[in-house]
C-alpha cells in the first residue's frame, strides 16, 4: 500500500472518528494472506475508549472503506481497530507533544552509555533529539536518528 492510498483511507475515516469524538492515533497496513489494516483510535483528549465505541466505529469504517474507488484492497484483508493501549507507541511529533511530562521508553539502534534503551520523563524534543529526565537531577539528550522506537512507559 502506498502513501497516497494511506492518505485516502485517512481522509475516509477521519470524519467518522470526528463525529464519534475519537482521534486517529495510528494506521498501518501489513501485506500477507490475508493482509491486515490496523487502525488505532483514541478518545478526544486521549480519554479511554470503550469496546462498544470500537465495535460501532469498526462497522462504520468497514462500510466507508468498501465504497472507496479504486478499491485499495482488491484482495481479502482483515480490518483491526483497537485502542493504542497504555504502553502505546509514539511515532509522530504530535504524539511527542502529547507525551511531554510523561514517562517514556526509548529503544536505540546502538548502545548509548552502555545501553540500547533509556527510560525517563520526556522533557523536550526537536527535529534532532529527544531529552529525557533520567533521574531528578539529570537530563540526557538522545539523537533521534539513533532511536528505533518510542513508547509510553506506564511501568515507570
UniProtKB/Swiss-Prot annotation:
A biological-process GO annotation: translation
Subcellular location: Cytoplasm
Organism: Oenococcus oeni (strain ATCC BAA-331 / PSU-1)
Keyword Acyltransferase part of the UniProt annotation: no
GO cellular component terms, A-Z: cytosol
Keyword terms, alphabetized: Cytoplasm, Ribosome biogenesis
Role noted for this protein: Required for maturation of 30S ribosomal subunits.
A UniProt-annotated Pfam family: RimP_N
Name of this chain's protein: Ribosome maturation factor RimP
HAMAP family: RimP (MF_01077)
Gene3D superfamilies (UniProt xref): Ribosome maturation factor RimP, C-terminal domain (2.30.30.180), RimP-like superfamily, N-terminal (3.30.300.70)
SUPFAM superfamilies the record matches: YhbC-like, C-terminal domain (SSF74942), YhbC-like, N-terminal domain (SSF75420)
Chief place where the protein resides: cytoplasm
Keyword field contains Cytoplasm: yes
InterPro entries attached to this UniProt entry: Ribosome_maturation_RimP (IPR003728), RimP_C (IPR028998), RimP_C_sf (IPR036847), RimP_N (IPR028989), RimP_N_sf (IPR035956)
Protein family according to the UniProt entry: Belongs to the RimP family.
Domain of life the protein comes from: Bacteria
